[in-house]
């Protein structure tokens, strides 16, 4: 069965959503938001913190910085880390 192609943005957001890894989102206007991604679609990200949800439009996001490293791809057999 052919492996389904997934874009990097969706792969990243889905990984942090599943892991419930807290992250910081910086908006283009300089605002800093922190929380956990609970859902996302093509246009927005739902961020949860202290029992409250915030709907953040992707076009307003500058940077997403997870609090812990995110591994998006499995290491290939035989590969070594430097």
Swiss-Prot record:
GO terms for cellular component: cytosol
Protein family according to the UniProt entry: Belongs to the Hfq family.
Gene3D superfamilies per UniProt: 2.30.30.100
PANTHER family with a match to the protein in the record: RNA-BINDING PROTEIN HFQ
Protein keywords: RNA-binding, Stress response
Annotated function: RNA chaperone that binds small regulatory RNA (sRNAs) and mRNAs to facilitate mRNA translational regulation in response to envelope stress, environmental stress and changes in metabolite concentrations. Also binds with high specificity to tRNAs.
Quaternary structure (record): Homohexamer.
Lineage, top ranks: Bacteria, Pseudomonadati, Pseudomonadota, Alphaproteobacteria, Hyphomicrobiales
Domain Sm, chain residue ranges per copy: 10-70
Gene Ontology biological-process annotations: regulation of DNA-templated transcription; regulation of RNA stability; regulation of translation, ncRNA-mediated
GO molecular function, one term: RNA binding
Pfam families found in the cross-reference section: Hfq
Protein name: RNA-binding protein Hfq
